Each structure stands twice: as structure tokens, then as C-alpha cells.
Amino acid sequence: MSGGEKQRVLIARALTQEAKILILDEPISNLDLKFQLETMKILKNLAKENNLIVITILHDLNFAISYSDKILFLKNGKINNFGDTKKIITTSNIKEIFSVDIDIVQFKNKNYIIPLE
């Protein structure tokens, strides 16, 4: 099995437990783009349909923007910001936490983070 196949099996196993809270650490890190999108859509739909709390640890901020209702930023192991995705994902918050200048652009009604050099 490839790393991506193993990761999909682990996610499926977690979903069969029928827990009310699901915590996934980098659930899409070993998946190709198609399966990243599918997995995040499935998780979001399951959360809505089953009143499930899904906590995902993601380093890809564009996926976080697209699929999260709320965002929590950690800095030096402590909570730096928590709240609605649209309020937390700002150029100043990204600069403070990651020391990176970004632009947030909108395309087809979705926000995307573009790092600036």
C-alpha cells in the first residue's frame, strides 16, 4: 500500500468508530490533490450531516480556509488566535505567526493565500 492508501484506510477506520468528535492530524498530507479534495469534502459533509465535531491539524492554510468554520493558531505552543476563519485568516495574523508576508486574493468566491517574496 502507498502512503496515501494507508492514510485513507486510517481515516475510514476512524470514521467507523462513530465518535462525536474526530481529531485528525494532517489527514491529507500523503494524498494526491484529487483525494485531498475528496477527503476534505467528505469530512465537511459528515460533520454537517451527523452533528460531528471534526478537528483537523493542517499546515496548508488554503485547505484550512476552504474547509474550516473556525481556525486556531498556535505560536510557541500557546493559542495565539481562535475564531471564525474569515476573521482569523488575515495578513497581519499570518505575518505575526509565520513571519511571512501574504496577499489574500478572492477567486470564484473563495479566498486564497498567496505568499509574497
Language-model regions, residue ranges each:
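Catalytic Walker B motif of ABC-type/P-loop ATPase nucleotide-binding domains
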Residues: 22-26
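A short, surface-exposed alpha-helical micro-motif characterized by mixed small hydrophobic
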Residues: 64-66
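ABC ATPase nucleotide-binding domains
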Residues: 97-117
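Conserved catalytic motifs of ABC-family nucleotide-binding domains
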Residues: 18
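Helical segment within the ABC ATPase nucleotide-binding domain
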Residues: 36-49
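ABC ATPase "signature
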Residues: 82-84
